[in-house]
């Protein structure tokens, strides 16, 4: 079972790296693309490629997460499956998935979708790294919602500064 856990961990880390890196680059490319007020075909291509990387990361996270679920269930590590941290990670993964669908359908403003994506991927990473986290599910999600709002505000400020500097984009 050690080998199975190692393989799952490697894939889970790979999915996280692709998701966090992709979300970061997507936001950078998006902000760079809108500074002149028009997203040209090359910028669109970069964004599509980056979103594909994020989707691959999400796919890997979901399937390695299902693998962890099965492994923990079969090896009797039920206590972890009942922890607040586990359910917070599952909730944030679901938010990443739903946000991706809403962005794809153009049913969510990009300022909000980008903030949710960026925050969610980093938050999921921190939850995976932070071994001794002692918070309830509600506390974790409260911090998460606050982080989404802060990231949305910071991204808005960055966009505002860029728009003032280049005088072509809209806020």
Feature map (PLM): residue ranges:
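Polytopic transmembrane helical bundles with strong interfacial aromatic enrichment
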Residues: 1-171
């Amino acid at each position: 079972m050690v080998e199975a856990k190692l393989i799952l961990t490697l894939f889970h880390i790979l999915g996280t790296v692709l998701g966090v890196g992709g979300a970061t680059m997507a936001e950078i490319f998006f902000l760079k693309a809108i500074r002149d007020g028009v997203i040209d075909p090359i910028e669109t291509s970069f964004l599509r490629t980056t979103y594909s990387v994020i989707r691959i990361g999400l796919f890997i996270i979901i399937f390695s997460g299902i693998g962890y679920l099965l492994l923990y269930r079969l090896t009797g590590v039920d206590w972890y499956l009942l922890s607040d941290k586990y359910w917070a990670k599952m909730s944030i993964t679901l938010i990443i998935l739903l946000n991706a669908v809403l962005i794809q359908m153009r049913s969510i403003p990009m300022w909000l979708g980008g903030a949710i994506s960026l925050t969610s991927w980093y938050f999921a990473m921190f939850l995976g790294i932070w071994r001794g986290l002692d918070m309830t599910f509600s506390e974790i999600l409260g911090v998460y919602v606050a982080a989404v709002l802060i990231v949305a505000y910071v991204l808005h400020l960055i966009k505002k500064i860029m728009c003032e500097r280049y005088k072509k984009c809209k806020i």
